[in-house]
Amino acid sequence: MNTEAEQQLLHHARNGNAEEVRKLLAAMARMEVVADIDCKGRSKSNLGWTPLHLACYFGHKQVVEDLLKAGAKVNMLNDMGDTPLHRAAFTGRKELVLLLLEYDADSTVVNGSGQTAKEATHDKEIRNMLEAVERTQQRKLEELLLGAAREGRTAEVSALLSRPNPPDVNCSDQLGNTPLHCAAYRAHKQCVLKLLRSGADPSLKNKNDQKPLDLAQGAEMKHILVGNKVVHKALKRYEGPLWKSSRFFGWKLFWVVLEHGVLSWYRKQPDAVHNSYRQGCKHLTQAVCTVKPTDSCLFSIRCFDDTVHCFRVPKNSVQQSREKWLEAIEEHSAYSTHYCSQDQVTDDEEEDVVSAMDLKESLARAQTCQQRLDREIYNFLKMIKECDVAKDMLPSFLQKADIVSEASRETCVALNDCLNLFTKQEGVRNFKLEQEQEKNKILSEALETLATEHHELERSLVEGSPPVSILSEEEFYDALSGSESEGSLTCLEAVTAHSFEENEVPGSSGKHRMSEGKDCGGGDALSNGIKKHRTSLPSPMFSRNDFSIWSILRKCIGMELSKITMPVIFNEPLSFLQRLTEYMEHTYLIHKASSLSDPVERMQCVAAFAVSAVASQWERTGKPFNPLLGETYELVRDDLGFRLISEQVSHHPPISAFHAEGLNNDFIFHGSIYPKLKFWGKSVEAEPKGTITLELLDHNEAYTWTNPTCCVHNIIVGKLWIEQYGNVEIINHKTGDKCVLNFKPCGLFGKELHKVEGYIQDKSKKKLCALYGKWTECLYSVDPATFDAYKKNDKKNTEEKKNSKQTSSSEESDEMPVPDSESVFIIPGSVLLWRIAPRPPNSAQMYNFTSFAMVLNEVDKEMESVIPKTDCRLRPDIRAMENGEIDLASEEKKRLEEKQRAARKNRSKSEEDWKTRWFHQGPNPYSGAQDWIYSGSYWDRNYFNLPDIY
């Protein structure tokens, strides 16, 4: 687009330079200038306004006419939600209002202040004019609705009733017939069902005192209208100002909205229009209204959970207003109760569902008639070919023609019967589908309401509860309260940095410590022959505060979560293959294990490595991009002493395989992960199916384990936070030693948040060592007897504190445990196995990445010439998101997904199976479980016949 031409168009439209506007429009028509006639201004004087808005506001009639003739959108909205008609009406320009109406301006559009053009004007004549136009437009829509109902055009009826300002579903013609009358006497079943679901009243009478039932044609139509069929009308939105009572703040005025069986209240009406800043809501299932005879303003609502909400109507038109509210609440309560309790199909509904046997018999009859028709036609044609036509043969031909004609009629009747059965079946299925969709919507809104209330209850319980153990931690309260996490993160960095200097892992070399948070520098400079890596991303992340995961998931209830396409704003600029690579951040633990001679000490290091593998997930609520089938990723880190290759080996189910090896041939680390997702209402759980295998080649040992379950909480309301829980069993297949780690769920008050505890046992289950810590911070080892004694004493102290609190509230402050400098209490005699490095200062702006994660998508020209074209670093949607180009990332993500679907369809047509390149399926050599094994030859760099996936 030509930005300069658009700025000129905006300037001339604002100043009324009609001649200049015509020149620009003519140049645009001749394609000499490419500009948008509906462009929006970006300067202070025209911000968010189109040329038509400006010309209407400043009263330049000729410019308005020229713009409309050139195709300017007459109902375009500016940033305040105003149409040009709003601006012309507001400034009292009658001629422009008439001109806009001639070009079909919509007078019913509501702006950001909740006003139509009629309500925005101060000119009485314009108001009367717009009211007359609205009545005319409304009557035209009503006539269209009546005509569509008479002719049985169900799609047109649905479209008219789905408009932002639909016609009255109970409008009438000159005879007093409503659309329901018209559809009923023409026996248009689908139209009748649609009208009833849209609120048509079957009790209304025409001028001859007839109801739709009196005009209905056929028993089936009468059956529907009598009401044997469960058809509930769609309720209209009802809203207005009400005073609401609060326990602490008394009476307060709100704008209250009733919609889809949910009562919501807002501070102001514009908030309700945009459904923002909702102050509260209540689901009306089984709700009951009560009034006090002595107070004509007051009424209360008792909800299904026995909570009572008191409201008071404004004093103007008290009785009438309260009656309307009570009627509306009763209707919405009945509507919500019906859809939340309707589980069984009624007998009448079952009768309408045509059985498979009926359909089969109908089709068989039609096929028999068709075969007879084919046979008679064949005989007729054969007779013509074999006989010379003579006068005496004409009667025979005529008789045969009659037989063929009769067979044709029978075939048509049979096929028509079959078609009618299928049509009836389709109608019933559509009706049931709409009912289930409505029920689904009601239940999802109920779930959101209950989750909000449950969240508030959790907050009140947590805020009112003191810590119950020295092992409890304060940052859990932040996770539930929704406060910012920067403070706790900074505190944690200070603690870990201080402790890291004092508790350095014995025997770890400087080379190994490079992975633990030291500044890696940036650019391509070399330090001691080791390449320096970048310390930040090209662009910070976009805020997700205005987006809700629940708004996406509520539309996908019942779907497999792995197949749901999420908006790119919820992603982080890494593929899941790159996220898997973060297992290798603390590779120094594997090197250390290889250097130790004691098998128990080796198991300690392996256990620490297994815990450290999930540490980077804390506060990483962004979803990695789903890898495309055939996508690969490689990482070579000379400074950390390993190289890794991974491949997406399956799309449904999504399976990622990886293989890493030490550069000094001291270890092999491999496995395959299938993240199985479950939606639990308030949380999403990811269970990483698949076996992880670590081979220490110098000791001829192999260890296998599975990762813990990851859960993202507060999907519906509150701040997202992550926890890991479940048992992880690490087995040494050579010695029989076993390490069982318990990743503890946090519980209600967060006492166990992030905790990891476990024991190393020999093959006779004798405890050799105890391990404890937090997967977000550190892991220690200690003598098992000492650990058991500490646990017993800690449990005793906890019970004493509870009893102390119950006997004397005055001693509560003295009994509160003093926070230690360590968020994990260190048992005397413990040995530090692993401590997480502090994240970089800019981590919060960089998707909460660790220093290791920052470099995973880094690419330079030298690397680009070496890696295969299937590598994640070359994936355009991830690259665009990393650069801050969200719109481009979304477009590229959609393009790649469509390309993958097209490739899958082509393989299906050609019956060609997908073949993985670098991995093959087979049993794990140690556990025997099905696994994906590295086939070799990747590092030979012979990348031929690779799929085109980007």
Curated annotation (Swiss-Prot):
Major location category of this protein: other
Residues passing through the membrane, by range: none
Organism: Mus musculus
InterPro entries associated with the record: Ankyrin_rpt (IPR002110), Ankyrin_rpt-contain_sf (IPR036770), OSBP_sf (IPR037239), Oxysterol-bd (IPR000648), Oxysterol-bd_CS (IPR018494), PH-like_dom_sf (IPR011993), PH_domain (IPR001849)
Domain PH: 235-334
GO BP term, example: lipid transport
GO CC aspect terms: late endosome; organelle membrane contact site
Subunit structure: Interacts (via FFAT motif) with VAPA and VAPB. Interacts with the GTP-bound form of RAB7A. Interacts with OAS1B. Interacts (via FFAT motif) with MOSPD2 (via MSP domain).
Chain positions of ANK repeats: 47-76, 80-109, 175-204
Signal peptide: none
Motif (FFAT): 469-483
Lineage, broadest ranks: Eukaryota, Metazoa, Chordata, Craniata, Vertebrata
An annotated Gene Ontology molecular function: lipid binding
Pfam families in UniProt: Ank_2, Oxysterol_BP
UniProt keyword annotations, A-Z: ANK repeat, Coiled coil, Endosome, Lipid transport, Lipid-binding, Phosphoprotein, Repeat, Transport
Tissue: Ubiquitous.
Sites bearing Phosphoserine, chain numbering: 499
Family: Belongs to the OSBP family.
Protein name as catalogued: Oxysterol-binding protein-related protein 1
Positions in coiled-coil regions: 430-463, 879-913
Localization, UniProt: Late endosome
Gene3D superfamilies referenced in this protein's UniProt entry, alphabetically: 2.40.160.120, 3.30.70.3490, Ankyrin repeat-containing domain (1.25.40.20), Pleckstrin-homology domain (PH domain)/Phosphotyrosine-binding domain (PTB) (2.30.29.30)
